[in-house]
Amino acid sequence: MTVLSEKKCIPCEGGIPPLEKKEIDKLLVQLQSKWQVNELGHLYKKYKFPNFVKAMEFANKITEIAEQEAHHPDLTISWGACSVEIWTHKIDGLTESDFILAAKIESINS
């Protein structure tokens, strides 16, 4: 099995169904972290930091990955925290690329 963080995000042009719950659950296990699927059906994780500057530095690292992968999460930055929400906008659901991006984000601090 290929590690998610070693894969590339594939741009979605729509016309495909979102992942089913069974597939989502398998991919969540592969992330091996505290990512969740929120009430909107998006991948979500809140990272905590000792201050605003560290949260912003983390967000900037995510920006670099997002640009490389051409897949962009929603980020909410506050004092001591950066929340990340990922989904494939074209289908308003989750694809494997969402999990690939989450894995790459997860590797920032490892």
UniProtKB/Swiss-Prot annotation:
Highest taxon of source: Bacteria
Organism: Rickettsia felis (strain ATCC VR-1525 / URRWXCal2) (Rickettsia azadi)
Endoplasmic reticulum in keyword set: no
The entry's keywords: Lyase
Catalytic function, reaction form: (4aS,6R)-4a-hydroxy-L-erythro-5,6,7,8-tetrahydrobiopterin = (6R)-L-erythro-6,7-dihydrobiopterin + H2O
Name of the top EC class for this enzyme: lyase
Gene Ontology terms describing biological process: tetrahydrobiopterin biosynthetic process
EC numbers on record: 4.2.1.96
Pfam families membership: Pterin_4a
UniProt xrefs under NCBIfam families: PRK00823.1-2 (NF002017)
Protein known as: Putative pterin-4-alpha-carbinolamine dehydratase
Family in the record: Belongs to the pterin-4-alpha-carbinolamine dehydratase family.
GO function terms (MF aspect): 4-alpha-hydroxytetrahydrobiopterin dehydratase activity
HAMAP family: Pterin_4_alpha
Segment forming the signal sequence: none
